[in-house]
Amino acid sequence: MTLNNQQLTLNCDMGESFGAWKMGADECVMPFVDMANIACGFHASDPNVMHDTITLANQHDVEIGAHPGYPDLQGFGRRSIKMTNDEITNMVIYQVGALQALCKAQYTDIGYIKPHGALYNDMMQSDGVFLAVVKAVALFKVPLMILASKENEKYLEIADDFDVPLLFEAFADRLYQDDGMLTPRTQPNAVLNSEHAILEQVRMLAESGRVKTASGQYILLEADTICVHGDNNESIALVQKIRQSLYTGGN
């Protein structure tokens, strides 16, 4: 059955290998997701990986999203880098433009933009960084994917000034705080490791738009899409179960 009268989609970070270094199992997880967030070369990926991931997404009719991050290969883009807002705007334009060019070489295009790691977190914590990202996204005339939270309306108002649609996402495997933000990875239990806990969080999001927070409270999250990860055999199997639960109600 379709839950909540509006089917939640599944998105996944992909194309994060580069050179001889292998990251993730894109070939295995791509058939089970709706949207592929493809790294653009700064936190991970390279032109060949980007090309191959675009090809793979096209083969499975998966929507392509640009996944720009800070220039931090060693830290996988999870370290915040101090930049001016103009520098952030230009950095995002540069990365998205590279992926868009590789898409056009295969007669396709990007469908949305989702920042990565520390840039994503900074965007959700600083209106200035959010505005800098929105200005970049506006040039590509696609939606921006951000974290669903209690402040959805605030972000909608800012983005609307630049005619940028927003896609709100929730995370299948992350523990939430009472304010709707993700528990920092530096804190214990920030990532849900139990298959039961992850499937239960997805079920609640689909049926009632709620999640249980670290303190035990239940909060509303108005999300359009759920982020999943497919880094190993166990996580790929879990993505399959998540997809089944969304499309069949777990039956």
From Swiss-Prot:
Q: Name one Pfam family in it.
A: LamB_YcsF
Q: What is its EC number?
A: 3.5.2.9
User: What keywords tag this UniProt record?
Assistant: ATP-binding, Hydrolase, Nucleotide-binding
- Keyword check for Transmembrane helix: no
Q: Which SUPFAM superfamilies does this one have?
A: Glycoside hydrolase/deacetylase (SSF88713)
Q: Name one GO biological process term.
A: carbohydrate metabolic process
Which reactions is this enzyme annotated as catalysing?
A: 5-oxo-L-proline + ATP + 2 H2O = L-glutamate + ADP + phosphate + H(+)
**What domain of life?**
Bacteria
Which Gene Ontology MF annotations are present? 5-oxoprolinase (ATP-hydrolyzing) activity; ATP binding
Q: Any S-S bridges, and between which cysteines?
A: none
Family named by the database record: Belongs to the LamB/PxpA family.
Q: Extract the NCBIfam families matched here.
A: PRK05406.1-3, PRK05406.1-5
Assembly and interactions? Forms a complex composed of PxpA, PxpB and PxpC.
Role, per record: Catalyzes the cleavage of 5-oxoproline to form L-glutamate coupled to the hydrolysis of ATP to ADP and inorganic phosphate.
Q: What is this protein called?
A: 5-oxoprolinase subunit A
Q: Which organism is it from?
A: Vibrio campbellii (strain ATCC BAA-1116)
Name of the encoding gene: pxpA
